[in-house]
UniProtKB/Swiss-Prot annotation:
Traits of the deletion mutant: Probably essential, it was not disrupted in a global transposon mutagenesis study.
Cell location: Cell membrane
Keyword match Signal: yes
Lineage of producing organism: Bacteria, Bacillati, Mycoplasmatota, Mycoplasmoidales, Mycoplasmoidaceae
Protein name as catalogued: Mgp-operon protein 3
Regions of compositional bias (Basic and acidic residues) in chain numbering: 164-175, 1037-1053
UniProt membrane topology term: Single-pass membrane protein
A Pfam family hit: MgpC
UniProt keyword annotation of Kinase present: no
Organism: Mycoplasma genitalium (strain ATCC 33530 / DSM 19775 / NCTC 10195 / G37) (Mycoplasmoides genitalium)
Length: 1053
């Protein structure tokens, strides 16, 4: 188990959120970076059985309960319906279908929109209420409804439904030859069998006119419950009133040895308990009429787009209509449903017509509206809805065809093509067939049917269909006629044999290898020989699916508001396909649609080891067209080679998984009308033994996770009805199961000539072993491959238990369960200090760690950017193995920071103080701590400052030397130049002085005589004074010369 689960490891981004206010007891988180709750957020829609607060918020009375709910763009949409509702049908007048005001049954279903009005936790406030009205009925439609009858649905107590082999029960073959029906008593005694059907055997039977059928205005049939204390027999008739006994006797099948009707009531079909489990409404012990049941069942599933709300039915009772409500509608607006009869589903009508032709050997040769399927007044399709969802503002839906009614209304009886079909209802039902391990060669030979020898074991799987034919008013203009049963078989192929034998109930395949022999619900048999073309068996079901655009929804709304008979809605991107009704496959037998069985087509169908095999539940394996849990989502990865599957959807059907991959192109639907270019790819993966052991009727919830590409289907099978009609715990059965389906899987590609198989990785597995002792269970949340959360009610209090995987079986972890606490209405389990709870335990270091680790020289930014240092500030004690945690730091100042933990939860994801969902804080309550005393400046700031100063001085010195040395050289050159100049000046001065001296001397000679006369006067020395200035060079001429030289140097440089 553990190895298997590792192969399908789920990265489930889910967090358990218990105890929400306003009785939204459970909601769950997504990835921490998610800013929005969407329709695809895993478990964003709360799952709980107690919704009284939402009911009161919607201003509805206590009779209302929640049928479905979804979240669209953070708003919550809830579908409410009342168990007190009563609807009536009147064949005359204009208001044919209406709420019954005389019995205070005017309690229609509602869709209510809520919004969150707080930023702390969730507090829902009503935005708008939409009422779901009853449908308009045109005159043509009324002609159909007047004579339409509905057959009893299957329940866990339906006759012939419990076919699974039980431990300790002996199953035997009963041989009845031609004319030996009266030997039943001896056969019974020989094998020690009871006169009434017991869990290990089933009785075939023939219904007389009107048995188990009801018109819309009549009460739903109910039959005597089984009493296991009387060896499988029914309760004594004294426990019934005479009216109830008489009604039950008239509607019970004939099961006596000779095939005649019994004078006393001693047989059964269903119980009140079983009918209530599928949604049948009662007034005390009396079921309400059929039309009320159909309305109540039709308001079961909800999907929301940007502009529309769509409501459809369920998998138990047929839906004849669906609602499309405009979100802009006023609260008091009349929101009428659209008839499926007024909706064209592409590929569907041809498939349905072909199915009837194949079954009855009847082929229509004209296209006039007077023939069966071309006239709305003679057809009434109904669907068992497996689910609806919305993706990218488009609706995805799927379901099974519950049945239809049609007539060959040709007036000629002379034509060989019409004589055998005139006045015959061309219809089919949801019944399955006889099963045989060896085929029907020995069972059905020639035309003997069951009057011939029975040399092999076989069983009848089902005995009831849903919508069945009627006859009497079979012409286009006929208005009167008796109501009688018309069998869906040609007149000349009817069998008159009475089928009343006890038959071995070995669960086998649904097809014969020597031809197809089928018994219908009414005790008539026909067969196709092996030399004839392989035709779909009546065990095959018509599975309808598609994607609906906003424009098509608007058309459906317009049709609903119309009272005309010619308003048609075209849903273009829909398809139909035959699906087999697998029980146990036999080798060499062809599957539906020409597919080979898994054993012969190269597929590896593995039964996982370590899983406890559980005997298939009779109901789950007998209801032929049962399907649950359609869930769609954005699928970015293509599934089939060469195809881009933008949207993916998964639905579980009886026997396997259907994957639908929608290819709408560039976020818009394909506009092509070419049916060969299908916008939808289809794949069917058969269940293995492990999945087949899960009772699909116990389905609770489905989630899709886009990141992992996994769908998780949750089933609650802890309580099952026993064969004595009482709710008793099944002690040897697991409480919960989770079927996990991957985005990819076995992909079937079919053409006209061959059938090939592409095998992609598949993650189809059952997570079982989750068992709870609580009485009221609301769901299972797979958190990871190691942990699951079981949500239950214990003494009217919501309780969360955490289960841990222990070698494939999940066992409760008491410590973790106790630690999942609330946070005063917050969204997440709160953290508890000084205790190892689900978040583990965080212990912070003292502030002295800064000095001890020499961190006082580091700054806040350094610490924040160094996780190794940051994580040394705390010690983490995990709550479970491999749980991890880290610290998230916030800068408080230049010298301090605040830290808080970021912890891994059970879902594998990390959460911190800032985690939100839809923008709302989680308020987990993680602790925080401030560390102070870090360096205001980094340790490198002072050294760098000093170094910078020294560097600058050094640069200046270098620059100074670089400039000073050349200037010194220039100065020396200047000095040398000055010396030379001054030498030249001195030479010149000397020369001039010599000239002057010679002049003076000569002048003195001229004046010698007069000078001699005055020789006594010595103070006259003028020449000496004249020569003095040239000998002393002034400073100014020196400066002017330096400037010139420097300029010259600059010029040179």
């Amino acid at each position: 188990m553990k190895t298997m689960r590792k192969q399908i490891y789920k990265k489930a981004y889910w967090l358990l959120l218990p105890f929400l206010p306003l009785a939204l007891a459970n909601t769950f988180l997504v990835k921490e970076d998610s800013k929005n709750v969407t329709a695809y957020t895993p478990f964003a829609t709360p799952i709980t059985d107690s919704k009284s607060d939402l009911v009161s918020l919607a201003q509805l009375d206590s009779s209302y309960q929640i049928a479905d709910q979804t979240i669209h763009n953070t708003n919550l949409f809830v579908l409410f319906k009342s168990r007190d509702v009563k609807v009536k049908y009147e064949s005359s007048g204009s208001n044919n279908i209406s709420f019954d005001s005389t019995s205070q049954g005017e309690k229609p279903s509602y869709v209510v929109e809520f919004t969150n009005s707080t930023n702390i936790g969730i507090k829902w406030t009503m935005v708008k209420k939409y009422q779901l009205d009853v449908p308009n009925v045109s005159s043509d439609m009324n002609q159909v409804l007047k004579n339409l009858i509905l057959e009893q649905p299957l329940t866990k107590y339906t006759l012939n439904s419990s076919l699974a082999k039980e431990k300790g029960k002996t199953q035997r073959e009963v041989h009845l030859g031609s004319g030996q029906a009266n030997q039943w008593t001896s056969q019974r005694n020989q094998h020690d069998l009871n006169n009434n059907p017991s869990p290990n055997a089933s009785t075939g039977f023939k219904l007389t006119t009107g048995n188990a059928y009801r018109k819309l205005s009549e009460s739903w049939p109910i039959y005597e419950p089984i009493d296991g204390t009387k060896q499988g027999k029914g309760k004594d008739s004294s426990g019934w009133s005479s009216t109830e006994e008489n009604e039950a006797k008239n509607d019970a099948p004939s099961v006596s040895g000779g095939g005649s009707s019994s004078g006393t009531f001693n047989k059964y079909l269903n119980t009140k308990q079983a009918l209530e489990s599928i949604g049948i409404l009662f007034d005390d012990q009396t079921p309400r009429n059929v039309i009320t049941q159909l309305y109540y069942a039709s308001t079961s599933k909800l999907a929301v787009t940007n502009n529309h709300i769509v409501v459809m039915g369920n998998s138990f009772l047929p839906s004849m209509w669906y609602w499309v409500v405009e979100r802009s509608a006023q609260e008091n607006a009349s929101n009428k449903p659209t008839w499926f009869a007024n909706t064209n589903l592409d590929w569907g009508e041809d498939k349905q017509k072909q199915f009837v032709e194949n079954q009855l050997g009847y082929k229509e040769t004209t296209s006039t509206n007077s023939h069966n399927f071309h006239s709305k007044s003679f057809t009434q399709p109904a669907y068992l809805i497996s689910g609806i969802d919305s993706v990218n503002d488009q609706i995805i839906f799927s379901g099974f065809k519950a049945g239809s009614v049609g007539y060959d209304s040709s007036s000629s009886s002379s034509s060989s093509s019409s004589s055998s079909t005139k006045d015959q209802a061309l219809a089919w039902s949801t019944t399955t067939s006889l099963d045989s391990k060896t085929g029907y060669k020995d069972l059905v030979t020639n035309d003997t049917g069951l009057n011939g020898p029975i040399n092999g074991s076989f069983s009848i799987q089902d005995t009831f269909s849903f919508v069945v034919p009627y006859s009497g008013n079979h012409t286009n203009n006929g208005t009167t006629g008796p109501i009688k049963t018309a069998y869906p078989v040609k007149k000349d192929q009817k069998s008159t044999v009475k089928i009343n034998s006890l038959i071995n109930a070995t669960p086998l395949n649904s097809y014969g290898d020597e031809g197809i022999g089928v018994f219908d619900a009414l005790g008539l048999n026909y067969n196709f020989k092996s030399n004839q073309e392989r035709l779909p068996s009546r065990t095959d079901q018509i599975f309808v699916y598609g994607i609906v655009s906003p424009n098509e929804l608007r058309s459906a709304k317009s049709s609903a508001d119309s009272t005309g008979s010619d308003t048609k809605v075209n849903w273009s991107n829909t398809q139909s396909r035959y699906l087999p009704v697998p029980y146990n496959y036999s080798e060499g037998i062809i599957d539906a649609d020409g597919f080979k069985r898994p054993e012969n087509r190269g597929a590896s169908v593995t039964t996982f080891s370590g899983l406890k095999s559980i005997a298939p539940d009779g109901f789950a394996n007998s209801i032929a067209n049962f399907s649950v849990g359609l869930k769609a989502g954005i699928d970015p990865n293509p599934v089939m080679s060469g195809k881009k599957a933008n949207y993916g959807a998964v639905v579980l059907t009886r026997g396997g998984v259907v994957r639908l991959n929608f290819n709408p192109g560039n976020d818009s639907l394909l506009s092509t009308t070419d049916n060969n270019i299908a916008p939808i790819s289809f794949s069917f993966t058969p269940f293995t033994a492990a999945e087949s052991a899960v009772d699909l009727t116990t389905f609770k919830e489905v989630t899709y996770n886009q990141e992992s590409g996994l769908w998780s289907y949750i089933f609650d099978s802890s309580l099952k009805p026993s064969h004595d009609g009482k709710q008793t715990p099944v002690t040897d059965n697991m409480g919960f199961s989770v079927i996990t389906v991957s985005r990819t899987g076995i992909e079937l590609n079919q053409d006209q000539a061959t059938t090939t198989l592409d095998v992609a990785p598949s993650a189809l597995a059952v997570q079982s072993g989750i068992q709870s002792t609580t009485q009221t269970l609301t769901g299972v949340l797979p958190l990871s491959e190691e942990f699951s959360a079981v949500i239950a009610k214990d003494s009217d209090q919501n309780k969360i238990d955490i289960y841990k995987n222990n070698n494939g079986l999940f066992e409760i972890d008491t410590q973790l369960s106790n630690s999942v606490a609330t946070n005063n209405g917050g969204l997440a389990p709160s953290y508890t200090e000084n205790r190892v709870d689900a978040w583990g335990k965080v212990e912070f270091a003292d502030n002295s760690v800064l000095q001890a680790r020499n961190l006082v020289d580091k700054t806040v930014d350094e610490i924040i950017n160094t996780p190794e240092i940051l994580n040394s500030f705390f010690r983490f004690t995990p709550a479970f193995e491999d749980q991890k945690a880290t610290l998230v730091a916030t800068k408080q100042s230049d010298t301090s920071l605040s830290v808080s933990p970021r912890i891994q939860f059970l879902d594998g994801n990390f959460y911190d103080l800032n985690s939100t969902i839809a923008g709302v804080p989680l308020n987990i309550g993680f602790p925080s701590r401030v560390f102070a005393g870090f360096a205001a400046l980094p340790a490198w700031v002072i050294p760098v400052s000093v170094g910078s100063s020294v560097g600058i001085l050094f640069i200046l010195l270098v620059l100074g030397l670089g400039i000073g040395i050349p200037m010194y050289r220039v100065r020396k050159l200047q000095d040398a130049s000055f010396v030379n100049v001054f030498k030249k000046v001195d030479t010149l001065t000397t020369a001039v002085g010599s000239v002057y001296k010679k002049i003076i001397t000569q002048t003195g000679v001229v004046k010698k005589a007069p000078s001699a006369l005055k020789a006594a006067n010595p103070s006259v020395k003028k020449p000496a004074a004249f020569l003095k200035p040239p000998v002393q060079p002034p400073s100014k001429p020196e400066g002017e010369q330096k400037a010139v030289e420097v300029k010259s140097e600059e010029t040179k440089s």
